């Protein structure tokens, strides 16, 4: 099995106002050896990003205060974090939502509820992009 070899030690931030989604993702990813941080909304996420410098960020679209599109846009407009992969999470699966996610700079769009394999595949497909943090 290739399970842990490429995920061990990766820092992942999960931003979602749903405690269930945060806990589920945190549990699944921690079992794979990831260091997982969670945030309840975009504002919370911005401070956690600055503090922990995650390798990959999962962001829910529909959140209070600062939604996922706004959060992603702020991340991608920051010189330090613009290359950090952002994967949008949403219960909506419309073409408009996916396109809007791309416009603000997200690398991928996962529809909730997601499976363990979808979550891990998303991380694997973008973790090579975050190897830049290994040397910094």
Show which residues each predicted segment covers:
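Receiver (REC) domain active-site loop signature in two-component systems and cognate sites
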Residues: 63
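C-terminal output helix
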Residues: 114-123
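Active-site beta3 strand of CheY-like receiver
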Residues: 52-58
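Charged docking surfaces used in two-component/phosphorelay signaling
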Residues: 23-31
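Short hydrophobic/Thr-rich beta-strand motif most characteristic of the beta2 strand and flanking loop
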Residues: 33-40, 48
């Amino acid at each position: 099995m290739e399970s842990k070899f490429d995920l061990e030690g990766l820092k992942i931030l999960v931003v979602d106002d749903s405690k269930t989604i945060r806990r589920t993702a945190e549990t699944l990813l921690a079992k794979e050896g990831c260091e997982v941080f969670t945030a309840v909304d975009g504002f919370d996420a911005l401070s956690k990003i600055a503090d922990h410098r995650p390798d990959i960020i999962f962001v829910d679209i529909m959140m209070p205060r600062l939604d996922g599109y706004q959060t992603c846009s702020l991340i991608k407009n920051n010189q330090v974090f613009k290359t950090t992969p952002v994967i949008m999470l949403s219960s909506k699966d419309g073409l408009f939502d996916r396109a809007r996610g791309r416009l603000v700079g997200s690398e991928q769009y996962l529809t909730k509820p997601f499976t363990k394999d979808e979550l891990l595949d998303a991380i694997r497909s973008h973790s090579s992009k975050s190897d830049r943090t290994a040397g910094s």
